[in-house]
A protein has these predicted regions:
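Transmembrane beta-barrel strands of outer-membrane/channel proteins
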Residues: 213, 238-242, 255, 269-275, ...
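Extracellular loop and loop/strand-boundary signature of outer-membrane beta-barrel proteins
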Residues: 241-243, 276-283, 321-326, 365-373, ...
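C-terminal outer-membrane beta-barrel translocator/porin domains of Gram-negative envelope proteins
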Residues: 363-515, 521-523, 527
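Transmembrane beta-barrel wall of Gram-negative outer-membrane proteins
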Residues: 268, 282-385
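Outer-membrane beta-barrel "beta-signal"
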Residues: 257, 546-553, 571-583
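Repeated loop/turn-to-beta-strand initiation elements of outer-membrane beta-barrel proteins
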Residues: 234-236, 263-269, 302-308, 346-351, ...
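Residues that define the transmembrane beta-barrel architecture of outer-membrane proteins
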Residues: 220, 249-253, 289-293, 331-335, ...
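Periplasmic polypeptide-binding modules associated with outer-membrane biogenesis and secretion
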Residues: 3-4, 34-244, 256, 274-291, ...
Length: 583
């Protein structure tokens, strides 16, 4: 009993000594002082980036069918009588410069042209409009005496949009139409504007909208009809995987709820909860536990999409100490806003500007005492550009972004205890290229999925801002994140066999989707930086597995391992299982 009461003063010394040691670790090298807070922040950023690029890929226009008949060349075969023409006038043009029109008409001027060539000229001018997305515009030949004037007069009717219907009926007060197609009534009908608005409506998973053009009430006008029969607006998802880490438990369980069009303005709401811990009935499945809560909302307005997001994360774990394990804990929160703008789209591609502002706060504790070196507030501004394109038989997405630490919202200053040796006013560049290439082999549907991601910063970064390798989302083959640094890259490649074993049963196909066996090969490298005590290194990983995807039930099982590189590990490969059910 006496010995149980006496450790009060020694325990205080243990706390102070351990705190000093941990503080020194944080101060010396953020890369060596990674916490569950840092891992959660990186994972959140990776998931948000993946979701954004997947959404951009889905919005990229599908390949159009080839034209059945190409426009005739100006020098083609003459049919019937020809007319001597000195020049050509095109009236009613408001969307193109005189030089653009002259480029099309010049080959037909100062020559004798027949009816076939006049029709070819009409097609060329019409295609000029179609290539810009002006699908309801046309060019025709008015009554005239060409033989007398030697001038060919043409008239362009630049069709305008008089109204927008939903399911064949006017919808004057519709917030759905107001946010998807703002300012389009009375303007020239532009297919790109229609595609953009349709993408904004179908951004919500409950929608499956299609559009059709109806004749307007006056000449030269059209009505856009949006056909949509939304499914239930709410969405639920539950899942579990064994992809957690030792510090916070191997079991990761999640639940999420979403709601579409809550306020009738194409708004999308999502809330999620995730818990990790040693929750499996067997031993050796981690030490600590964690809980996270997150939410986001997005609202479109034509070519703009505005968003807000937030998250809260907390963990309890332990670290080795001289006298036994030491209890650690921490929490972090994040609040952000964003604005994306589609700046260009055509029949093959979309280009988007992305911007965001995020406030981040992190607290870490040892034996209940706050570790100042590992606790901080900081703010990051982001600006980027994304481009998706269908080319070379596949879908390509390119993304480049710049992040800057800002002196906003009580952000930690350089040299403060919370900053350690990291620079709170850091700058960093990140780039990503993804490629999805379907092909057939022996009548089987196969697909290659590749991603290359890299990061560069001239500064020393907080752990949450660093680049990491290891775990399921980067170089596969380990449960834990193995390498950290300010600069690095990784490459992931998957060969997927897309089978449809449930194609003969509509209900089973809806429930389970496709079965997709796959093999993967990954490589990543972290650059060494001696001045920041970052050793760097590289790692190779391989994966083999199979998944159910595309239905209400998603299931992924496989095995991955490291087969090369500089990482020092003592465990064997990872057998992983992940499952989720959504409605």
């Amino acid at each position: 009993m006496t010995s149980a009461r006496r450790p009060a003063a020694p325990r205080q010394n243990v706390v102070l000594t351990a705190s000093a040691m941990l503080a020194a670790t944080f101060a010396i090298s953020p890369a060596a002082a990674q916490t569950p807070n840092d891992d959660f922040a990186r994972r959140q950023a990776q998931q948000a980036e993946q979701q954004r690029l997947e959404t951009l890929g889905r919005m990229t226009p599908k390949p159009a069918q080839a034209e059945a008949q190409a426009p005739a060349a100006a020098g083609g075969k003459k049919t019937g009588p020809c007319f001597a023409i000195t020049h050509i006038e095109v009236e009613g043009v408001g969307q193109f410069s005189a030089a653009a029109i002259d480029k099309v008409t010049a080959p037909y001027a100062n020559r004798c042209v027949g009816v076939g060539e006049i029709n070819a000229l009409l097609r060329d001018l019409t295609h000029l409009y179609l290539d810009k997305g002006f699908v309801s515009s046309r060019v025709y030949v008015p009554a005239q005496d060409i033989a007398k004037t030697k001038v060919l007069r043409l008239v362009a009717v630049e069709g305008t949009l008089s109204d927008i219907y939903i399911n064949g009926k006017p919808a004057p007060g519709s917030g759905v139409l107001a946010t998807a197609f703002p300012g389009m009534k009375g303007e020239i009908t532009n297919l790109r504007d229609i595609e953009q608005g349709l993408d904004q409506i179908n951004r919500l998973s409950s929608n499956n909208a299609k559009t059709a053009m109806l004749p307007g009430k006056t000449d030269g006008t059209s009505i856009l009809n949006v056909e949509n029969k939304p499914e239930h607006p709410w969405h639920l998802s539950f899942g579990n995987s064994n992809l957690g880490q030792e510090q916070t438990g191997y079991s990761k369980s999640s639940a999420s709820v979403g709601y579409d069009n809550l306020f009738g303005i194409n708004d999308q709401w999502n809330f999620a909860y995730e818990h990790s811990g040693p929750d499996y009935p067997w031993r050796d499945d981690g030490l600590g536990k964690s809980n996270s809560y997150s939410g986001n909302v997005s609202v479109p307005y034509g070519y703009w999409t505005f968003s807000a997001n937030g998250s809260w994360y907390e963990y309890d774990s332990s670290v080795p100490g001289n006298f036994g394990p030491l209890q650690t804990s921490g929490d972090s929160k994040q609040l952000g806003v964003g604005a994306d703008r589609v700046i260009f789209r055509d029949k093959d591609s979309i280009t988007t500007l992305n911007s965001g502002l995020t406030y981040k706060e992190t607290n870490n504790f040892l034996l209940g005492n706050k570790i100042e070196v590992g606790s901080r507030k900081y703010t990051v501004g982001d600006l980027g550009i994304s481009h998706s394109r269908r080319m070379l038989g596949g879908l390509w997405v390119f993304d480049l972004s710049y992040s800057q630490g800002l002196n906003l919202f009580d952000a930690v200053a350089p040299g403060d205890a919370g900053a350690g040796d990291a620079d709170p006013r850091f700058s960093k560049f990140t780039g990503t290229i993804t490629m999805t290439r379907p092909f057939e082999l022996a009548s089987q549907r196969l697909e290659i999925n590749s991603i290359v991601t890299g990061q560069y910063s001239p500064d020393n970064l907080f752990g949450a801002e660093q680049f990491s390798l290891g775990g399921y989302s980067t170089v596969r083959g380990t449960r834990e994140t193995m390498l950290y640094g300010n600069n690095g890259f990784f490459i992931r490649n998957d060969l997927v066999w897309r089978t449809q074993p449930f194609a003969g049963n509509a209900e089973l196909a809806k429930m389970f989707g496709e079965f997709r066996p796959y093999v993967g090969l990954d490589y990543g490298r972290i650059a060494s930086q001696a001045r920041y005590r970052i050793d760097g290194g590289d790692m190779f990983g391989w994966t083999v597995g199979g998944k159910l995807a595309g239905g209400h039930v998603n299931f992924d099982i496989g095995y991955s391992d490291i087969f090369g590189g500089t990482v020092d590990r003592h465990d064997s490969g990872l057998l992983f299982v992940s499952t989720s059910v959504r409605w």
